[in-house]
Design a protein with these regions (language model features):
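Nucleotide 5′-phosphate-binding alpha/beta core
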Residues: 1-98, 104-233, 244
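Intrinsic disorder/low-complexity segments
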Residues: 237-241
Length: 244
């Protein structure tokens, strides 16, 4: 089934008008966005620490809130693991993304529902605007499946939160009707072992009409190598074997 109905074009036209206003005055948009986030977090432990409720400008925010790094934020975020809510953002972050970072070993960064909604909106904007500007190619793009290569969607419970790879957390939240176009599917995405998961993804992808591919470049290369190796073996079977 095609993903190219009139509603996609209508959404793209609407968002293009909105984004045009952003492009005309990006500094003003960023300023309003910062102050909106500050107001939202004003009643958290972090917001009270720096009196977010009284901040009215970017300059005031810069003067009052010191530049932070992971080491300075870690004690605050660790409180979420113990079930404390309203620490650096309203409520309790359901998930934490595990990342090795570049220094100091593993790091755990909160992932909120608002963050995932923002990522989903960006993805929708990307596809819709592409469809609006290149309708000829978009019909082919939306006529196949979207293959995402990321971490496992099986998360680990750590206290009051769940921990996993950021891409796995996002993939696990893909909802209907997008699931019908999402590959490799929930069954394979939930496999924890990397070698088994990438092998199963390659097997399934080789049989699908993949028109959209997303993932970490190094992981994408591994997948494509597996698909190519499978194709070579299929065309040149070992002596004594038959093609399936």
């Amino acid at each position: 089934m095609s993903l190219y109905p009139a509603i996609v074009r209508a959404y793209a036209a609407f968002r293009e008008l909105q984004l045009a206003r952003v492009h005309r005055d990006p500094m003003s948009v960023q300023r309003r966005t910062l102050l909106r986030l500050v107001r939202r977090a004003a009643d958290t432990a972090w917001g009270r620490q720096f009196d977010y409720a009284s901040i009215r400008s970017v300059a005031e925010f810069q003067r009052r809130v010191p530049i932070q790094n992971y080491a300075s934020m870690k004690p605050w975020w660790r409180r979420n693991f113990d079930g404390e809510a309203d620490i650096t953002w309203p409520g309790l972050p359901p998930w934490f993304a595990a990342t090795s970072g570049t220094t100091s070993g593993d790091k755990y960064v909160p992932v909120t529902r608002e963050l995932l909604r923002s990522h989903a909106r960006v993805s929708a904007d990307l596809l819709a605007l592409y469809a609006r500007r290149r309708p000829d190619r978009a019909r082919r793009l939306f006529g196949g499946v979207f293959l995402g290569i990321g971490g496992t969607t099986t998360l680990e419970r750590r206290g009051a939160v769940q921990v996993g790879d950021a891409s796995g957390i996002a993939a696990g939240r893909v909802c209907w009707p997008l699931t019908r176009w999402y590959s490799p599917g929930r069954d394979i995405a939930a496999i924890v072992d990397w070698e088994e998961r990438i092998g199963r993804i390659a097997e399934r992808a080789a049989k699908q009409n993949v028109t959209f591919l997303a993932g970490i470049p190094s992981w994408v290369k591994v997948l494509l190598d597996r698909v190519l190796c499978g194709a070579v073996r299929s065309r040149n079977p070992e002596p004594g074997t038959r093609n399936p």
